[in-house]
Amino acid sequence: MAEVSAYKDTLNLLQTPFNMRANAPVREPEIQQFWADRQIYETLSRQNPGAPFVLHDGPPYANGALHMGHALNKTLKDIINKYQLLQGRKVRYVPGWDCHGLPIELKVLQELSSEERRNLTPLTLRQKAKAYALAQVEQQSQSFQRYGVWADWDAPYLTLTPEYEAAQIDVFGQMVLKGYIYRGLKPVHWSPSSRTALAEAELEYPDGHTSRSIYVAMPIVQLSEAAQPLLGNYANLALAIWTTTPWTIPANLAVAVNGELTYAVVQAGDCHLIVAAELAESLSKTFATELTVLATFPGSVLEHSRYRHPLYDRESPVVIGGDYITTESGTGLVHTAPGHGQDDFIVGNRYGLEVFCPVDDKGDFTAAVGDRLVGKNVLKDANAAVIEWLTEVGALLKEESYAHRYPYDWRTKKPTIFRATEQWFASVEGFREQALQAIAEVDWIPAQGENRITSMVSERSDWCISRQRTWGVPIPVFYDEESGEALLNAETIAHVRAIVAERGSDAWWELDVADLLPEPYRSNGRRYRKGTDTMDVWFDSGSSWAAVASQREGLHYPADLYLEGSDQHRGWFQSSLLTSVACNGHAPYRRVLTHGFALDEKGRKMSKSLGNVVDPAIVINGGKDQKQEPPYGADVLRLWVSSVDYSSDVPIGKNILKQMADVYRKIRNTARFLLGNLHDFDPAKDALPWEKLPELDRYLLHRLREVILEIQDAFESFQFFRFFQTVQNFCVVDLSNFYLDIGKDRLYISAPDSLRRRSCQTVLAICVEALATAIAPVLSHMAEDIWQSLPYPARTKSVFQAGWVQLQDDWNQPELAAKWQQLRDLRSEVNKVLEQARRDQAIGSSLEAKLQLWVADSDWRAALADRNPADSLSGTAVDDLRYLFLVSQVELRDQPTGLTEAKYHAQTEDWAIAVVDAEGQKCDRCWNYSTTVGQSSEHPDLCDRCVSALQGTF
C-alpha cells in the first residue's frame, strides 16, 4: 500500500542475519568447524564441573558405508551426551570400531587374483585386512562427524591396536586362570562355506528355507525290563523318528523320548510303530494310512530299550531327553546324533555316548560313514543319498518338504550345520548364576530388555570362542607336538600379552614359537607348536570394558550407559556381560538402552532389491536429483531421531522426511522472529525485572518454565519423542499462534524504547536463549546458529558453554496460568467466528472487526471489563482484550440479547460472541480501525496510539 510507505521507516521491522533458509550443506559444516576451532567439546568434556558421564560406544563393524541404523544409533548417543554436557557433566565419548573378523578377510580375498590368493601368507592377509579396516574407519568417522556427533574422533578405540589386543588377552587370561576356558569336542554352529565355527550372533534366519524332512523306522531289538511286559507281544516293533536333516542319520547313536509324554503302539500294515499318542491321528494323515492305536504307555518305560540302526550294523539305546521333545511336530521321538546337535550332545553326554561326527570342515562325509556315502556333501548330495539308502532297506516311512527357520552364515548367506569339532569354549555354566544376578542389578530400557537377555543367558550353551581364521586376535595357546596337550597358563599368557602390547598380534605370526614362549619352556625337552585359532570377534568387542572403559582417562567402569540396537541382547550386551562377570563378578554397565531398527514407511526392512533404502548421506547432502532428494542437512535427520519411539522399529522415508523438514522450518522461523525483534535490544540495559512485566509476559514465562521442565524430563528419561512434541507445540501453539501473534502490534508499532515493547523483548530474549539451549542436544547446528546470531553480546562463545536453561522460581504462576488458559480457550472460540467471516470475505484482516462479547459468570465479566479500557492509551496496552483477540475494538455486554442476530456469531450457555464491522477509520500505520484517526493535524491518517508512538510515549 502506497500510503503505508510514508510511515514504514517508523516501524520496528525484523532485522537479523539469521536466515529463514538453513542452507545446511554449507552452514552445518561451518558450524562444525566453529566447534572444532574453539575445541568446544574437548574443553567441556574435561573442564565441566560435574561428575563424569560415560556412554560407552558399542563398536560398529569397520566394513561398508553407514546406513540409517548407524545414524539412528550415533545420533541417540550424541543427544544424550550433549544433554549431559549442558547439565555440566564431564562427558568423554570415545568412539570405537570392530576391526577383525571374516567379512574384512573376505573383502581382502575378493580383491585378489587367484594367483595372489595362492601365494598369500597369513601375515600378508593380515596387513591387507588392517589397511582395509583402517580405511573403512576413516570413511565412517567422517560420516559420523557430518551428523554433528561429538566424540574423541582423533583417539578412537580400534580392536586391532596393540593396547586393545593386549587387554583382550588379559581378559582371556583371567578367564583361563579362573577355570572358565576349556577345550573340547562339541557340536557348534559350523559354516562349511566359511570353514569356521560361528557364534549365535553370527547367524541369521532368512525366510523361505525348506528342508527335506523324513520319517524313519528304527527296529527295536531289545525292550527294557519296564517295557517288556507292555510291548513284548508286538512283532516287527519299531521306533518312528522324524528329522529335517537326513544327512545326520549315519551319525545316529540314540533315540530320545520325553519321560512325561504318553506314547502309543500303532499298527501300520504288518509293522508296529511307537509314536507319541497325541500325534497318532495326524500321523495317519501324513502317512496316508490308518494307524490303529493298540496300547498306550508312559515314555519313561522305553528307557534302556535298544534298536538297530537302519543303515549300519550297530545297536543303540533309547534315552530320556529333555523338554525339547514335544508333540508340536514330528513323532514325539527324536533322532539323536551327539556330534550334530546341542540337545543331542547334552543327552549323549549324560548317557556316555560317543561324540561321533563323520563330517569334515567342508561339509563332506568322511570315511567313517562307509564307501557308499564318503565324500558326499551334507548340504548338497548327501540328503538324497541317505534317503535313497533308507528307501532301499525299507526304513523310510515318509518324505516331505518342511519350511522352517534354519541358521545361515550371516556373511556368506549360506546354510550352516551343527558339527562337533575341537574348539575353545568359555564355560558359561561356571558363572551363569552370577551373570543372571548381574543382569537383575542393571537398569534396562525398555524394561522388556531384561527379560530378553535373562532368557538368553539362562538358556545359552557354553560360548565357543575359537575361530579358524587368520584376521583376529590369536588364542595364545601352544600344543605339545607329540601329545597334542595344550600349554596355557599364567606364565605363557603373560609373556604373549607383553609381546602383543608392544608389537601387536601380528607377532604371533611373525615370531617363532621359541620367541613366543617364556624362557623356562624353550628348552624343557618338549617341542611345541603355536595354535592357529583366533578369537571370536564378539570376544574382541566384548572386552572393550577392559580395553577402554576401565583404562582411558576420563572414563570409568562400569559405564553409565550402553546404547545399541535390540539385536545386541545376544551380541555385544551379552558378550560384554559374560566377560565382565567372569573376570569381576559384575556387569560392565549400570544402564542399558536399546532401540529398534530403521524400516521404510510401509514398515518393511530396507533392501536394495526393494529399492527402499534411505541413505543418511543422501538425506543430509541430497541426491543426484536434488528436487527428488533435497539436501535436508544433519539437523533434519537428528530431528527425525528425536521424533520416533525408538523402543520399537522406526519408519523413515520421503514423506516422513518432508514432515520433519516442515517442523524444522517452523522452529527455525520461530527463532528468526525472536531474533529479528531483538535487533535493538541489550538485556544488560533494556531488560525489565519480572515484577514490572505485564500479565501476558509473566504467563508466557510460566509456560516457558513448564516447557523446559517437560523437555528436561524427556531427556532424563530418554523419551526424546516428548522433546519433539513439546518443542513443536511450544513454537507453533504458544509462540507463533498466540504470544507472537499478539505481540506483533507492540513490537512493530510501539516506540522503540517503550515499556510495552521492552517488556516483550525481555521475554523474547529469555525465550530465544532458552530455545537455543533446549534444542541444542538435538538440533545442534540450528541452536549454535541462533546463538551466533544473538544481536547482543552472548554470555558464552557457544550455546553449549551456556549450560542448561536456568529457571526462575518467580516464573511459576499456576493461578495466573489458569486465568490465561481460560482466556486462550475463549480466544479459540472467537477465532472460529472470525474465520467464518473471513471465509465469506466479510472481513480481510481480523482488525477490520469489532468483537461483541457476553460471558455468563459475573465475576469473570468484571475481570474482562478490567481488560477492556475505553481509551486506547490507558490500561497496560498489552493485556487488553483487543490485543488478545486481534480486533480493533471489544464491546462487553451485560446480556447476550441481540448478539445472535449478528450474521457472524456463536453462543453457549456460558458465553455469546458476535463479530461486526469495526468502528472508525483504518490507521495507515498500524492498520487498526479507530475513531481517533484524523484527530491529529500533524498525522491526520494515524490513530492516537501511533501518534503517541511517534512522540515516544506509547
Curated annotation (Swiss-Prot):
Belongs to the class-I aminoacyl-tRNA synthetase family. IleS type 1 subfamily. It is an enzyme of class 6 (ligase). A motif ('HIGH' region) lies at residues 60-70. L-isoleucyl-5'-AMP binds at E564. IleRS has two distinct active sites: one for aminoacylation and one for editing. The misactivated valine is translocated from the active site to the editing site, which sterically excludes the correctly activated isoleucine. The single editing site contains two valyl binding pockets, one specific for each substrate (Val-AMP or Val-tRNA(Ile)). One of its GO terms (molecular function) is tRNA binding. Its EC number is 6.1.1.5. Catalyzes the attachment of isoleucine to tRNA(Ile). As IleRS can inadvertently accommodate and process structurally similar amino acids such as valine, to avoid such errors it has two additional distinct tRNA(Ile)-dependent editing activities. One activity is designated as 'pretransfer' editing and involves the hydrolysis of activated Val-AMP. The other activity is designated 'posttransfer' editing and involves deacylation of mischarged Val-tRNA(Ile). One of its GO terms (biological process) is isoleucyl-tRNA aminoacylation. It catalyses: tRNA(Ile) + L-isoleucine + ATP = L-isoleucyl-tRNA(Ile) + AMP + diphosphate. Coiled coil: none annotated. This is Isoleucine--tRNA ligase. Keywords: Aminoacyl-tRNA synthetase, ATP-binding, Cytoplasm, Ligase, Metal-binding, Nucleotide-binding, Protein biosynthesis, Zinc. It comes from Synechococcus sp. (strain ATCC 27144 / PCC 6301 / SAUG 1402/1) (Anacystis nidulans). ATP binds at K608.
